[in-house]
């Protein structure tokens, strides 16, 4: 059975653990139709447009 040769230091353990629980950064672009922030390559949830065409009907 595999056994570690040396004990991992506390700082090394914490440094590795921080990367697991770090929040994921989400890319944001601006909708050319309404100017609201949206995710790239997705339909705008505020106006329903994607690529200059209306995909979703947003009721006001």
UniProtKB/Swiss-Prot annotation:
It comes from Kosmotoga olearia (strain ATCC BAA-1733 / DSM 21960 / TBF 19.5.1). It comes from the Bacteria. Pfam families: Ribosomal_L32p (PF01783). This is Large ribosomal subunit protein bL32. GO terms for biological process: translation. NCBIfam families: rpmF_bact. Keywords: Ribonucleoprotein, Ribosomal protein. One of its GO terms (molecular function) is structural constituent of ribosome. GO terms for cellular component: large ribosomal subunit. InterPro entries: Ribosomal_bL32, Ribosomal_bL32_bact, Ribosomal_zn-bd. The keyword Membrane does not apply. Belongs to the bacterial ribosomal protein bL32 family.
């Amino acid at each position: 059975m595999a056994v570690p040769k040396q004990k991992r230091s506390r700082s090394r353990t914490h440094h590795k653990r921080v990367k697991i629980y770090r929040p994921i950064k989400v890319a944001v672009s601006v909708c050319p139709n309404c100017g609201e922030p949206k995710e790239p390559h997705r339909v705008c949830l505020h106006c329903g447009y994607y690529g200059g065409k209306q995909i979703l009907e947003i009721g006001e």
